[in-house]
C-alpha cells in the first residue's frame, strides 16, 4: 500500500505505478505497510486528493503536475514518524513480477533531504525513468530493507524527528531523459498543496 507517482488509465495493460511512498507512525511490526482508511475522511477534486490513514494517524495530501508530485504528510500521533520509499514497486500482472520487473536500478542519497536515481523496468514495454525525491525536513535515520530474491531496486525506511501535528512535504520529479531533467521538472513545475 502507498502512493505511487504515475499511472496508466484504461489501457488494459499493467505498467507504471513507480516510486511507491507510504507514511506511517510507530514501530514496524512484521513489515505490515498497510492501513485502513475511512471514506468519509477522503477529499478529492481536480488536482487534489487527501485521506487519513487511520491505523497510522497520518493525514495524506497529494497534488501533481505533468512531471512532478507533491505529498504532504501530517503525523498526528506521538509516535516515531517514518516514510517508506519503495523503488522496487510497480503495477504488475502477477505478484511474483514485483521482484523481477525492475531490470536495473541506481540510487544515490545526496544528503538528508534528497534521493536521486534511475530505474529500468519491463512490464508492458521496457522503459527507463529518472527521479529526484526531495524532503522539506531532514530524515534522522535511514534503513535499507532486505531485498527479496531477484529484486534490483531498493526499499528505504526513513525516520523523521517530528512532534504530533507536524508534517513532512515530499516532492518527486520524474524524467525519461536524465536526473537533471527530473530536477528541472521540480524547479519549473512548482506546485503547492
How should these model regions be labeled?
Residues 1-193:
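Accessory carbohydrate-recognition regions in carbohydrate-active enzymes
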